[in-house]
Amino acid sequence: LINDNISQKDKEVLADFILNSNRFTNGPKVKEFESAWSNWLGVKYSVMVNSGASANYVTMAVTRELKGHHGEIIVPPIGWVSDIASVINTGFTPVFVDVNMKNIAISYENIKNAVTKDTKAIVLVHCLGFNGLSQKIIDLAKEKDLLLIEDCCESHGATFDSKKIGTLGNMSCFSFYFGHHIT
């Protein structure tokens, strides 16, 4: 679908970096980008990893550390496979909750009906540039002591109550894969 979004100038900058650098991970450019990204989002910290899938896995590893090694994670039935694979691969059970047609996100009512004593977190995927949050979802997560994890890979720049998505939950994931759009 996208075959011409990497310009010749982009390729030249990348080639220059590869030819003149001896450090390809966790170098000064990564730190510079983490700082710029944090400033743009309006948050204190950002941690860059190699992919949105890895970011999903990191959020589940953190969930396991904070909430224990077993339990349920509320997830939507649509999104990217890594949202579900990260849940399963860290020992949790995904609980699928249907999305609404307004913003293609799981709704407060469906989340509320799915919460059990074993629920540890909610993975809210913001799809296709939409914001999937509501104050009711934020309040429910706090009331039930659930982690709210925002997958923002498809909705960079979307807002809720004048704040960028990805800043209202406990953790968030973004992806800069070339096929994702920046809203």
Name these PLM-found stretches.
Residues 1-23, 28:
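N-terminal "arm"/small-domain region of PLP-dependent enzymes with the aminotransferase-like
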Residues 23, 28-72, 86-88, 96-98, ...:
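Phosphate-binding glycine-rich loop
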Residues 48, 75, 121-124:
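A short beta-strand submotif of the Rossmann-like class I SAM-dependent methyltransferase core
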Residues 78-84:
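Conserved coil-to-alpha-helix start sites within the AMP-binding
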Residues 91:
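Structured binding elements
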Residues 102-183:
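Active-site phosphate-binding strand-loop segment of PLP-dependent enzymes
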